[in-house]
Regions:
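Short, hydrophobic transmembrane alpha-helix segments
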Residues: 36-46
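Transmembrane-helix bundle segments that line or gate the permeation/cavity pathway
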Residues: 20-38, 53-76, 80-84, 90-207
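Hydrophobic multi-pass inner-membrane translocation pores used for secretion
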Residues: 1-28, 44-46, 57-70, 183-387
Length: 387
């Protein structure tokens, strides 16, 4: 009940973020329901249905990440003193955020279920003519219990991810707010680069001859056969970019502070170094997804006879929207965390234009470093497949 009351009294922007989480959960739930419909309509094609279900893990992970990012920026999670005075400790705050995330995702998957049943014609009306019957399993009984159990994985995954990310951390220096030591610089940059390089090498080795056999990377709307080594290489490269994200953001800050920086460069660089842990992972995921999307477009441009399917478009839209929204939410969280520092700078005489120019310089530095790296990884990933 407390989660519902807080949702009713939330700011419109907070409600908008939760609505976006519900829409992401609805898109992921619709993809999962389509796998159930395909399995019901093609009982003999179990391998194909299983592959379609495995492809749903990408939007499921993106939805969970977006749900965690939204829970981090929830005002109730940041007002710890007031909540503690009201009798809600750190553990109960985590439970409250988990319940709110679960309710939001449950709302989304219920909407997906209603839309799916309406398109199939199971709610007392004709089935949708514009949709392929194979995607919905029209004319075949839908196992409702199995569909509900599969849909339950969306709010369950988001709830577990939120509980793990927002769990109370008891540290020795919790009482020291101002005299706490600095956070150590990220150490995952060399490991991330090594993983990305290893993934590209695995893909180059295992993709020999796949072009001649038509074994390009399949997506769940059209193609089924898939070279496992190519998928493993892509996955390893993706994890490498995600792991290297905090180190890359910290490197951007170091580059801005290199030489004899002025006040603007020094301020921008220090902020990037301090916020590398908070911004690095969402930006790393965004770079990985952007690299994979660019590589997939390049691969399928080389094979025009294999167009993207409807499920591929829905899944790609969910993943891209979630990772972009997660990166923007992380930037908003970083801005909220620096509220005291910004207020101190304003009291010292820093104008608003200086702060805006510092933010623009940080964004420009991130684009200059991350965009070429993302493009390079995508190009190297597609070279063995299109040549």
């Amino acid at each position: 009940m407390l989660a519902l009351r807080l949702a009713r009294g939330s700011h419109p922007l907070v409600l908008l973020r939760r609505l976006c989480v519900a829409l992401a959960a609805a898109g992921t739930g619709f993809l999962m329901l389509s796998t159930i419909g395909h399995a019901a309509g093609h009982p003999s094609a179990a391998d194909e249905s299983l592959l379609r279900l495995l492809w749903c893990t990408a939007p499921l992970a993106a939805t969970a990440q977006f749900a965690v990012s939204t829970a981090r920026t929830d005002p109730a999670a940041r007002l710890q003193r007031g909540m503690t005075a009201a009798g809600l400790g750190p553990l109960r705050l985590t439970l409250l955020a988990t319940v709110s995330t679960t309710l939001t995702c449950v709302l989304g998957v219920l909407v997906a279920l209603l839309v799916f049943l309406r398109l199939r014609g199971d709610l007392g009306g004709p089935s949708a003519v514009r949709f392929d019957a194979d995607l919905l399993g029209v004319g075949h009984p839908l196992p409702l219990v199995g569909a509900l159990m599969l849909l339950a994985t969306v709010p369950l995954t988001a709830a577990v991810a939120t509980a793990v990310a927002l769990r109370p951390r008891h540290e020795a220096g919790d009482a020291e707010t101002e005299g706490s030591p600095r956070i150590a610089p990220p150490s995952g940059l060399p490991w991330g680069i090594a993983m990305a390089a290893a993934g590209l090498a695995i893909e180059a080795y295992t993709s020999r001859g796949t072009g001649a056999h038509g074994g390009l990377l399949p997506l769940p709307g059209r193609l089924i056969s898939s070279p496992p080594g190519v998928l493993a290489g892509w996955a390893l490269s993706t994890f490498g970019l995600v792991l290297a994200g905090p180190g890359l953001v910290h490197l951007c800050g170091r580059l801005l502070c290199a030489g004899r920086p002025g006040a603007l460069r020094l301020l921008s660089g220090r902020v990037l170094q301090e916020e590398s842990h908070r911004l690095g992972r969402p930006l790393g995921v965004l770079c990985a997804v952007g690299s994979a999307a660019y590589a997939a477009m390049k691969v399928y441009e080389a094979s025009p006879s294999r167009p993207f399917g409807l499920l591929t478009a829905i899944g790609a839209a969910v993943v891209l929207a979630c990772v972009t929204a997660s990166a923007l939410t992380a930037a908003l969280e970083s801005r909220s965390a620096r509220a005291r520092t910004t207020a101190a700078l304003r009291r010292l005489g820093a104008s608003a234009s200086v702060l805006y120019r510092a933010a623009a310089l940080r964004a420009l530095a991130l684009v200059i470093v991350l965009a070429p790296l993302t493009w390079t990884v995508a190009e190297m990933a597609t070279l063995p497949l299109v040549h």
